[in-house]
């Protein structure tokens, strides 16, 4: 059962109700709270483009609690994050696994955060193919290309060497928020909201 809370605001013209995600969008907050698929990616890409059109100079805050999902859908979000002019602060609550971890690391340098009990996991893309040998070979080459692309992205955003990333993503690699900070996936572990305000003031 999918329950989405509604928020009621008083305006000069009377009451106006928003679903909670639309209300957060008014505050330039985007929330990824599910697996990553094409539908989810299309909504997030549209939100990013809308917020850039509204004000290309103001930051966007991107909250992430995701087990990951489709690489192609995730890359659509990633590329849009890099494409738009706005700085994007990413913040993990709960988990950021697989593609979720890539999106967390893809935030603007110095503005990537996690809450204390968050779990972050990186690994190589998964693949399970059946069919003719030639089809399996085609898919194998594609998943190896995707793995190389993802490893290059993680190397770019963490400052780690490609060889180190390749080794560390060979199997599921779970990290605490503190470990993710040391690794370079995030910049700071936040306990209170004031922490991010202080970090912004110091940036």
Swiss-Prot record:
It is an enzyme of class 3 (hydrolase). GO terms for biological process: protein quality control for misfolded or incompletely synthesized proteins. Coiled coil: none annotated. Disulfide bonds: none annotated. It comes from the Bacteria. Its EC number is 3.4.21.92. It is found in: Cytoplasm. Its main location: cytoplasm. Keywords: Cytoplasm, Hydrolase, Protease, Serine protease. Cleaves peptides in various proteins in a process that requires ATP hydrolysis. Has a chymotrypsin-like activity. Plays a major role in the degradation of misfolded proteins. Fourteen ClpP subunits assemble into 2 heptameric rings which stack back to back to give a disk-like structure with a central cavity, resembling the structure of eukaryotic proteasomes. This is ATP-dependent Clp protease proteolytic subunit. The gene is clpP.
